[in-house]
Structure formats: structure tokens, C-alpha cells
């Protein structure tokens, strides 16, 4: 299938959305014939990821916003070192601030000395000395590709919070979309000054033997970067809200929406769509709880239902709509994800996946309280934009 064409079975209703994303960049391709597992437990991701790493024969590509020097990070690190000793190519692209500030440099030097290539995301096209650019524009993607056969992406970084403490959503994927995720990694690696041992075809996807009925998911990558004139992910949220008929349920840990997104939320409710936002009651980042709530009043006045989830911190970034389309990704509903960071998300055009996602959302609702009062400090909007 041509990169810019849509498969015959693509749902007519969502063709304008898919084409809109393709116009934004050919990396936002549609892939047919995929299979996936929705992961909502860090322990489940740990189990699957470690097993897939153990099976690796050719290469392991990882890019993370956070790769911890803790129980989770060291467990994965030790296995990566083992695979490197076996001759597997192992590459880790880490967000620059995490690389420089969060972990002692010896941690990464030891990995590199023992065969794991580790470099910070620097985006060399803007110059290695552009300190401000590197600080302000972060690699927020969470991607693993193993042997071109299996990939992971979503909201989970790699440290103890994500494996053992928080509630998050991630995907394990097989099928043609793995090629797109690997291409994204390879471009970021090269942009950061990294090299490859072999020509690109060596890292091409390898077919996976699997029953045909399991590989029926239509998926589209949605990639964002500060170099683009507009945010593809913001377009996705607004398009779905503007065209929804029944419901749109959204989970995000951070909520600092531009006015255009607030307008789309309000417009959907005005048409009779059931719009719900789920956010954490307690946020992991100072001031962000208050900043989130600075937007509640506008949403509540429009009729959007806001649910704050107690218990463990919910870091999930998902959308489900009309039992037809869903999103799982790394992007928050905030200015930084839309306009400043390097992000990647998956758009899934599939009824079974969306219904499953809706059931997960409703299950999470059991630990929420609905917000009725939105009279919070609006000045926090200005504070956030200064960060």
C-alpha cells in the first residue's frame, strides 16, 4: 500500500481525519493488519517486555523520557547488557534532561562500555550548543522496538513508578506499524548523532507468524514535534470531538488546553455528546493539580463531566469515542505536548479495541469522584505557560 493511500476497508467516516494527518506528514501513516494488547498494569508491561527482550536476536531499540536508576531500570539494564554480550545491537535514546540530571553519568558510561549504545536526544540539526532548545523541547516518546517484530508505546516510562506504583496505559503491538515506530526511532537516533552498524534494510520489519483474525487492527501513527507548524495530536482531539455522535471519554494527567480544544469540548456537549474527562486527584508534579483545576470552570459550564481519580496516580493518556476510534499515546492535553515536545501516539480505528478501552475507562471510574465546583485559581494558566 502506498504511504499516502488508505486501505479499502478503512471506515468512511474517519477518512477525512486520516487524510488530514497524512497531509501533516508522511510519518503519520495508516497501517493495516496489526494486533495489539492494551496494558494497564506496570507489572504486565514488565512481564511482557522482559520476555521479549530475552527473545531478541538482532536488535533492541529504546527511546524513553525517563529510564530509571532504580529496581525497574536496573532490571532492564542488566538484561540489555546480557543481550549486548550475546551480540544483539542495543540502543537507548534517552531524553536529554534525564540523561544529564537525573542519573549519575557513570550509570550510562558503564552501559556503553559493556556494549549498549546510549546517547541523549539532542537533535543535532539545531546545534549541539543550543542549550535552551534542548531544555525546552524534550523527547517525550516511550518506544521500544525489538527485531522489527514487536513494539511497545504509550504512556509508561521505565522506572519504579511505572512498573509498580502508578496506573498507566501502554500498548504491545505486532504487525506493520512496528516499521513506523522503528523508523521514528531511527530518525531520532540519527538526528542525535547516532549511527547504525548496517544499512536500513537490516532493521526492516520481520514477518510474524500469526492467525489472520488476530491481525485486523487499522492503526495510524500520530507524530508531533516543535518543528511542525501545527500539532497533529491537537488536530486529532479536536476532529474527534467536532464529529462525535455519542460519547468521548478522555484520560490525561495534565490538562492545560488551548482555547480551540476548550471550544471543541463545549461544542461536542452542545450537540448532545457525553464528554468526560478523567484526571488524577493528586498530581505528581508541584502546582499541576492547581493548574489542571484552573480549566475546570470553563468545562463544567459547558457541561463536560470531570472525574478525579483517587488511589494511585493515573498517568494514562487515552481517548475512546463512539465505540469506533481510540487513542493511546504519550501526549498530555497540554501546551508542552502539543507544541514543544517530541511526541508519538497511536490512533486505532477498531471497534473491539475501542469498546475494550471504554470498559477500562468505566472501570477506572469506580475510583473517581465527580467534580461539581470549578471555582479554582485561573491565574495558574499564566503560571504554567511560563514554565
Q: What residues fall within each predicted segment?
A:
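Charged, low-complexity intrinsically disordered terminal segments
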Residues: 1-387
Amino acid at each position: 500500500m502506498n504511504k499516502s493511500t488508505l486501505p479499502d476497508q478503512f471506515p468512511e467516516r474517519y477518512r477525512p481525519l486520516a487524510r488530514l494527518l497524512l497531509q501533516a506528514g508522511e510519518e503519520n501513516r495508516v497501517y493495516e493488519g496489526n494486533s495489539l494488547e492494551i496494558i494497564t498494569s506496570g507489572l504486565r508491561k514488565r512481564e511482557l517486555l522482559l520476555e521479549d527482550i530475552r527473545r531478541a536476536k538482532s536488535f533492541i531499540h529504546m527511546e524513553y523520557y525517563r529510564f530509571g536508576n532504580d529496581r525497574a531500570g536496573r532490571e532492564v539494564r542488566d538484561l540489555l547488557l546480557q543481550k549486548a554480550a550475546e551480540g544483539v545491537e542495543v540502543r537507548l535514546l534517552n531524553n536529554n534532561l534525564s540523561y544529564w540530571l537525573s542519573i549519575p553519568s557513570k550509570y550510562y558510561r558503564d552501559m556503553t562500555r559493556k556494549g549498549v549504545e546510549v546517547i541523549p536526544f539532542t537533535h543535532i540539526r539545531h546545534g549541539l550548543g543550543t542549550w535552551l532548545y534542548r531544555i525546552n523541547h524534550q523527547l517525550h516518546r516511550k518506544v521500544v522496538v525489538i527485531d522489527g517484530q514487536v513494539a511497545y508505546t504509550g504512556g509508561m516510562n521505565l522506572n519504579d513508578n511505572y512498573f509498580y506504583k502508578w496506573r498507566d496505559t501502554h500498548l504491545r503491538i505486532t504487525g506493520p506499524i512496528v516499521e513506523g515506530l522503528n523508523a521514528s526511532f531511527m530518525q531520532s537516533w540519527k538526528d542525535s548523532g547516532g549511527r547504525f552498524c548496517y544499512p536500513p534494510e537490516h532493521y526492516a520489519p520481520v514477518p510474524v507468524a500469526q492467525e489472520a483474525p488476530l491481525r485486523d487492527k487499522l492503526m495510524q501513527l500520530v507524530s508531533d514535534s516543535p518543528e511542525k507548524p501545527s500539532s497533529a495530536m491537537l488536530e486529532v482531539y479536536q476532529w474527534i470531538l467536532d464529529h462525535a455522535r455519542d460519547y468521548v471519554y478522555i484520560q490525561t494527567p495534565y490538562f492545560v488546553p488551548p482555547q480551540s480544544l476548550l471550544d471543541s469540548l463545549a461544542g461536542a456537549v452542545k450537540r448532545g455528546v457525553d464528554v468526560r474527562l478523567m484526571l488524577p486527584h493528586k498530581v505528581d508534579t508541584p502546582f499541576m493539580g492547581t493548574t489542571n483545576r484552573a480549566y475546570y470552570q470553563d468545562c463544567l459550564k459547558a457541561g463536560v463531566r470531570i472525574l478525579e481519580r483517587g488511589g494511585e496516580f493515573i498517568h494514562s493518556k487515552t481517548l475512546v469515542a463512539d465505540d469506533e476510534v481510540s487513542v493511546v499515546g504519550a501526549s498530555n492535553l497540554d501546551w508542552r505536548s502539543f507544541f514543544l515536545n517530541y511526541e508519538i501516539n497511536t490512533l486505532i480505528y477498531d471497534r473491539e479495541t475501542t469498546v475494550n478501552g471504554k470498559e477500562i475507562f468505566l472501570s477506572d471510574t469506580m475510583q473517581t469522584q465527580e467534580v461539581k465546583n470549578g471555582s479554582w485559581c485561573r491565574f495558574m494558566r499564566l503560571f504554567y505557560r511560563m514554565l
